[in-house]
């Protein structure tokens, strides 16, 4: 029998168990006051019965190929066992339902345990990703020196530049990739930072409620647009406009430039910066604003001298998180900035980023024992550490320098 069907049946039985426990507790309440409300008695009966059967199904699925290889065609055995466990658990739980039974405490403990498991699972997944990337990166650094990777200025995995280099597979200097990444991120933040902050100030301090109810959702809609759409916009509109404008003034501009990618990426990040800044500004106590206005300060002076200083740690933290978002962007850079590893600070030239090269290295049928493919994991490791540091700095700034108001 299909696992999905078994789980659906267990779910339906759990619903029936809930109403069974609910009816019994309602009957008991007629004679004596219950410790917990009837809904908790139904919930504990449904949770205990269903959870026991679901755990059995999970264990069976995980180990059936190794422990029960001859039973692969006999899922009916699993169905019978799960139903038996369900009714057995339901029977003993049903007997415990009495007036003094602390069903609410049991349900709360189960919910707390479930939340703990979810939190631990998220942490374990992150640790697992980090360890897997470290393992593959270590294989890469066995072939390519770490110093060459971190400080080399030539990136060309497909082109051998010297015979004694690992398998003559090319150059693995990652400096051009990180330079391009930070160049595009810097351009993006020059757009997203001021515009996002100014829009947040307008929405929180100047806009009326009716205007805010219209403008804020429209601004946040930008965050839901797929990045490939932004990429098309960069290729079709922004890049040709920059190239034609540069030609008009006698400036040589590449058809794919860091400026085009950075401008469009900045537009994409504006809702992110605006939303965080708006929340931080609204968190400033109204008493501070009223006090500033009460001593004769204008609204603009209140914003400049009271609101912004009070909200500054949160704003800086939000900007650093936006930088992490910009560093991790891929699609816009692929379409608008190109894939050539060019070490330059000229925004009119084509550059590439770490995320783009990770995609390039892993596209197609690749051998995972070659330095070319393993370089993607090394790039991912450095990018992971970089964004982790930025996120930590952002949280540290918010927590350490946030002013506490009574």
Name the predicted role of every residue range:
Residues 74-90, 172-202:
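Transmembrane alpha-helix signature in integral membrane proteins
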Residues 98-104, 187-219, 394-400:
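Transmembrane-helix boundary motif in ABC transporter permease subunits
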Residues 217, 221, 276, 281, ...:
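Transmembrane alpha-helices
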Residues 279-282, 286, 293, 320, ...:
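C-terminal transmembrane helix and the adjacent membrane-cytosol boundary/short C-terminal tail
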Residues 189-191, 202, 209, 252-294, ...:
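Membrane-cytosol interface at the C-terminal ends of specific transmembrane alpha-helices
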Residues 135-175, 230-266, 338:
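Membrane-interfacial helix termini and adjacent extracytoplasmic/periplasmic loops
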Residues 333-384:
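Interhelical loop and adjacent transmembrane-helix boundary motif
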């Amino acid at each position: 029998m299909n696992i999905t069907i078994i789980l659906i049946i267990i779910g339906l039985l759990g619903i029936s168990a809930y109403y069974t426990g609910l009816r019994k507790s309602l009957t008991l309440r007629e004679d004596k006051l219950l410790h917990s409300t009837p809904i908790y008695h139904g919930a504990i009966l449904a949770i205990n019965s269903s959870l026991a059967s679901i755990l059995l199904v999970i264990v069976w699925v995980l180990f059936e190929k190794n422990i029960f290889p001859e039973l692969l065609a006999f899922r009916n055995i699993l169905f019978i066992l799960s139903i038996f466990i369900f009714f057995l658990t339901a029977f003993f739980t049903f007997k415990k339902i009495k007036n003094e039974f602390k069903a609410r405490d049991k349900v709360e403990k189960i919910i707390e345990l479930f939340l703990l498991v979810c939190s631990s699972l998220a942490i374990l997944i992150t640790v697992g990703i980090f360890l897997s990337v470290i393992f593959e990166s270590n294989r890469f650094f066995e072939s390519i020196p770490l110093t060459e990777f971190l400080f080399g200025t030539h990136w060309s995995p497909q082109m051998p530049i010297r015979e004694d280099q690992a398998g003559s597979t090319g150059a693995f200097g990652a400096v051009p990739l990180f330079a391009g990444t930070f160049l595009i991120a810097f351009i993006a933040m020059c757009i997203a930072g001021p515009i996002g902050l100014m829009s947040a100030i307008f929405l929180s301090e100047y806009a009326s409620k009716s205007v805010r109810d219209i403008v804020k959702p429209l601004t946040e809609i930008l965050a839901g647009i797929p990045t490939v759409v932004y990429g098309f916009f960069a290729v079709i509109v922004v890049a040709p406009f920059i190239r034609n404008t540069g030609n008009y003034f006698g400036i040589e501009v590449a058809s794919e430039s860091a400026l085009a990618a950075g401008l469009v990426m900045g537009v994409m990040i504006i809702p992110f910066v605006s939303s965080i800044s708006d929340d931080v500004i609204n968190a400033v106590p109204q008493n501070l604003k009223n006090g500033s206005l009460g001593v004769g300060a204008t609204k603009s002076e209140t914003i400049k001298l009271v609101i912004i200083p009070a909200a500054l740690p949160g704003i800086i933290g939000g900007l650093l998180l936006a930088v992490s978002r910009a560093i991790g962007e891929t699609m816009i850079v692929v379409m608008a900035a190109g894939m050539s590893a060019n070490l330059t600070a000229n925004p009119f030239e084509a550059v590439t980023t770490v995320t783009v090269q990770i995609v390039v290295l892993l596209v197609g049928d690749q051998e995972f024992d070659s330095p070319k493919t393993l370089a993607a994991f090394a790039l991912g490791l450095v990018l992971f550490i970089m964004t982790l540091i930025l996120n930590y700095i952002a949280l540290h700034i918010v927590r350490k320098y946030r002013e506490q108001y009574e």
